[in-house]
């Protein structure tokens, strides 16, 4: 057999296997069947299995008998594949599908539809193929951060369909105040969605093998709760609405009410993400910050277990308190130095190891340096102590109007690869919304996450970008001359702090008493012509370069639009 691997670097713009995530294919020759992509109308199951939800060319397919059906399918849990895996064989006259489970059957039809779409686009019949496909990571969720804004409700249903076609199987939704809490009505914002609406979305997602799980911040990041007058008495510091007092019993009464509403709104969820990051506490009752953090963590993990949810916890604070945090983000430090830090400070963790809840998932987030020795060592520490660890990478970090660093694809690929190597259950793609960029701008990073969490790390990043262009804009647009997203990142990044003074800090502008004086550059003095331009010469040159790049990008996008590209909506967002 000749093996044709779709994640091979020889992938070409006229290839009918332009699929994300990529699949491994074997075929005797590059032969074609007698099957017309537009004439696949009936499917038959030898075991009376039901046709899953379908898309595109298969959207209107119906059940037929054995003779009239082009597709013959069955579920067989004895096949040697992981859950969600499937075998798809395209023969001269028939298409045969054997799936490990219902989820695998759904993904087999998703893959088949993309093959049919590509055959139609290439004006060929359907290629003869033999496919055996399964995920590299079991749990492949994205993060939906609703803290700062929401989209139209219909957008989220469309998003579910988009994610399903990428074989994403989970969402962790950071609800904050975007759930209309029944138990604590003061917390839900004016644009929050009802529990009933969230149930409807959860049902829609579940039918497409996507499980929605809630994230409700607890110990810290609690301003959306503690800003309300009736909850001020629960603050850790009376003057700050950032954190709860973990020793006040009413803290848990309130938090558990929110959890119950969130669980009701996500009836199919397996997890309850409890947050817990970036919080410093007042030491009280002779307890250290680490002890206070673990008191809270144990109480909320016990609650989660009682309500049949697995708690997920951002893990940074215990590692900070123990003194092993910084090496995770330092790629300049040597392995020897990292080991010395751990040898000195690991005792700070081990002194409380019995208080680390065993039912929690410790989410080791690292968005830029996931491949550092320090980060990998921290993940191994959890596993070595029989604690469950899962990574979190990022498709959008913070404070920019579009993702940076090639949509963060190198880091996504790296963390997915190490997660597979360490045989972890999954990986989360965070998508932070601090600047409320348009969600469409996250789509390339999401596609990369789908690629490397399902198919592994064999596809080079350059080839993935080419595949993304082909898949989203058309098979004729794979060449580098049509690439523009990486170029556009540069002017967006430059404008981030273009008008800030040397000591200006953009995220903190809203908290400054007079940011126009303390953080923003001065305006020109008309009585001193030329002085301002000389002082800000570097900024002016950056602005000129930014404009030049933007004009080139605009030309490429307009060329794509005029050349009848697919996905005009995405192009219009970039434009």
Language-model features: where?
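Bacterial N-terminal signal peptides
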Residues: 1-6
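Generic recognition of short, well-ordered alpha-helical segments
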Residues: 53, 110, 154-155, 373-377
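Short amphipathic alpha-helical segment that frequently serves as the phosphate-/nucleotide-binding helix
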Residues: 55, 156-157, 409
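Substrate-binding groove of N-acetylhexosamine-processing glycoside hydrolases
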Residues: 17-33, 49-51, 200-203, 209, ...
């Amino acid at each position: 057999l000749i093996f044709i691997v779709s994640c091979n670097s020889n992938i070409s713009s006229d290839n009918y296997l332009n699929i994300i995530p990529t699949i491994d294919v074997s075929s005797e020759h590059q032969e074609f069947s007698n099957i017309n992509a537009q004439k696949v109308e009936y499917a038959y199951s030898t075991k009376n299995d039901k046709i899953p939800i379908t898309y595109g060319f298969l959207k209107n397919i119906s059940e037929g008998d054995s003779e009239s059906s082009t597709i013959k399918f069955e579920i067989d849990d004895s096949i040697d594949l992981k859950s969600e895996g499937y075998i798809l064989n395209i023969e001269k006259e028939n298409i045969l599908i054997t799936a490990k489970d219902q989820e695998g059957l759904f993904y087999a039809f998703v893959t088949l539809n993309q093959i049919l779409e590509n055959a139609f686009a290439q004006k060929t019949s359907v290629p003869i193929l033999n496919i055996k496909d399964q995920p590299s990571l079991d749990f492949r969720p994205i993060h939906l951060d609703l803290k700062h804004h929401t989209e139209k409700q219909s957008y989220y249903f469309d998003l579910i369909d988009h994610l399903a076609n990428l074989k994403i199987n989970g969402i962790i939704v950071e609800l904050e105040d975007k759930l209309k809490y029944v138990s604590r009505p003061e917390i839900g914002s004016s644009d929050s969605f009802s529990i009933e609406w969230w149930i409807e979305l959860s049902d829609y997602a579940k039918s497409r093998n996507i499980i929605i799980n809630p994230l409700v911040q607890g110990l810290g990041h609690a301003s959306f709760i503690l800003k309300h007058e009736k909850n001020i008495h629960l603050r850790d510091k009376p003057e700050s609405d950032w954190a709860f007092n973990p020793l006040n019993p009413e803290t848990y009464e309130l938090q558990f009410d929110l959890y119950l509403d969130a669980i009701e709104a996500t009836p199919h969820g397996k997890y309850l993400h409890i947050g817990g990051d970036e919080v410093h506490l007042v030491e009280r009752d002779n307890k250290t910050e680490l002890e206070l953090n673990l008191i809270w963590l144990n109480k909320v993990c016990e609650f989660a277990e009682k309500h049949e949810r697995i708690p997920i916890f951002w893990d940074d604070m215990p590692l900070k308190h123990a003194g092993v945090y910084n090496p995770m983000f330092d790629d300049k430090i040597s392995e020897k130095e990292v080991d010395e830090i751990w040898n000195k400070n690991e005792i700070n963790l081990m002194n409380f190891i019995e208080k680390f809840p065993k039912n929690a998932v410790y989410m080791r987030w690292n968005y830029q340096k996931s491949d550092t020795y320090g980060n990998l060592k921290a993940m191994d520490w959890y596993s070595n102590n029989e604690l469950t660890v899962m990574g979190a990478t990022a498709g959008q970090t913070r404070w920019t109007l579009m993702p940076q660093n090639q949509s963060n694809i190198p880091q996504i690929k790296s963390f997915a690869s190490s997660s597979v190597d360490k045989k972890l259950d999954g990986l989360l793609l965070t998508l932070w919304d601090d600047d409320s960029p348009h969600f469409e701008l996250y789509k390339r990073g999401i596609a990369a996450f789908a690629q490397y969490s399902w198919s592994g790390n064999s596809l080079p990043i350059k080839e993935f970008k080419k595949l993304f262009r082909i898949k989203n804009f058309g098979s004729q647009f794979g060449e580098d001359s049509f690439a523009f997203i990486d170029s556009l990142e540069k002017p967006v990044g430059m404008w981030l702090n273009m008008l800030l003074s040397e000591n200006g800090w953009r995220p903190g502008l809203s908290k400054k008493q007079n940011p126009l004086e303390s953080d923003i550059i001065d305006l020109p003095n008309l009585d001193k012509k030329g002085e301002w331009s000389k002082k800000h010469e570097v900024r002016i040159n950056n602005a000129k370069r930014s404009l030049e790049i933007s004009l080139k990008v605009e030309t490429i996008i307009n060329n794509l639009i005029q050349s009848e590209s697919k996905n005009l909506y995405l192009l219009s967002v970039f434009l």
